[in-house]
Amino acid sequence: MSKPFFSIIVPAHNSAAYLPVCLRSIKNQSFKDYELIVVADACTDNTAKIANWYTDKIIETNYGRDGLARNVGIDAAEGDWLLFLDDDDWWIHEYVLDRLCHFATHTDADLLPFQFIWPNDAHGRYYWDHAKYGINIAPWSKMYRRSFVGDTRFSDAERTSDEAFAYGLIDKIERGEGKWFFIHELYYYYNYMRPGSQTEVHSHEQGTV
């Protein structure tokens, strides 16, 4: 059996109320050559059961850290390219994987950041373009060549887990071991306003390069 083009990794923690929206945005993609890996981490609800409606590749862990859960997903991934979604976020249309496949096959880049949008209760919505505002360290805002990631992993520190992964890969590029390509297209909805979300706790939008 051939390996998938994409491995999509979703760390999930007690997200039964939100996970279906996330996973439906993946299942609704017109491009189907992918594997979906849900890492149900330290869950006390029926997150794993809900995930089972969408994929048979579910890994249950008890770390209580989204970075370590992502590491488990990376280790299990078989695809040529890696993508991450947080359990309460979603892709904004059904052609995201089609577009990402296009850029993966028409560039020689290893790390490809794309635009995302998030809500703000005072000012409506904001969007992030890495080329304009700096490289945001959020792992879900990029596509990664699996061979380029290699043994780079997230740390076990709650507040700096994403930094370890992002800066490890940026260092590789600065050493000439990989290439960027900035995608000026909007793909990702970052559900920052959901109380208790992974992204709200870790304030991804604060970290830029």
Over which residues does each language-model region extend?
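Short loop->beta transition adjacent to catalytic acidic/histidine clusters or analogous donor-positioning motifs
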Residues: 3-7, 27-38, 46, 55-57
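Acidic helix N-cap motif at the loop->helix transition within catalytic regions
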Residues: 17-20, 45-53
